[in-house]
């Protein structure tokens, strides 16, 4: 039973339809926070999206830094419930290698729990 639950949770984060690949994640602490997700590796993407799980979260700003030093600002300003995803974010210039993704966010509601912010990419 525990193995089935663990496999189900693992699959919900690692397997996505239509070619989406898990890039990385961060856990948002209670209150306002700024986090950096270092990407690295040889993968390149045309699109990314953000998925929030385990608690509600307000994402105010998202900065995407590319391997060549360019920066893309995405002003999301969205409140996400657990399980919600952002819109698909098209990266300029076709397939791009990511260096890092920076988030400015805060947990919302009265719960003092943490929300998980996962970044997914599509080639």
Q: Which residues does each predicted region cover?
A:
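Bacterial N-terminal signal peptides
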Residues: 2-9
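Transition segment at domain starts
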Residues: 15-38
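Solvent-exposed serine/threonine-rich low-complexity stretches and specific carbohydrate-binding patches
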Residues: 24-28, 73-81
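Exposed aromatic-hydrophobic patches
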Residues: 35-40, 85-93
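Noncatalytic modules at the cell exterior or secretory-pathway interfaces
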Residues: 43-50, 93-109
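Short, surface-exposed beta-strand/strand-loop-strand elements in extracellular ectodomains
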Residues: 54-76, 112-122
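A short local loop/turn or secondary-structure capping micro-motif enriched for an aromatic residue
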Residues: 58-59, 81-84
């Amino acid at each position: 039973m525990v193995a089935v639950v663990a496999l189900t949770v693992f699959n919900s984060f690692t397997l996505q339809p239509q070619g989406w690949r898990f890039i990385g994640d961060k856990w948002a602490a209670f209150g306002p926070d700024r986090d950096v997700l270092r990407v690295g590796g040889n993968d390149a993407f045309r699109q990314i999206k953000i998925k929030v799980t385990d608690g509600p979260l307000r994402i105010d700003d998202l900065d995407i830094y590319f391997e060549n030093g360019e920066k893309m600002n995405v002003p999301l300003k969205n409140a996400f419930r657990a399980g919600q995803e952002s819109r698909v974010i098209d990266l300029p210039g076709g397939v791009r290698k990511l260096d890092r993704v920076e988030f400015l966010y805060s947990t919302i509601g009265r719960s003092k729990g943490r929300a998980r912010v996962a970044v997914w990419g599509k080639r």
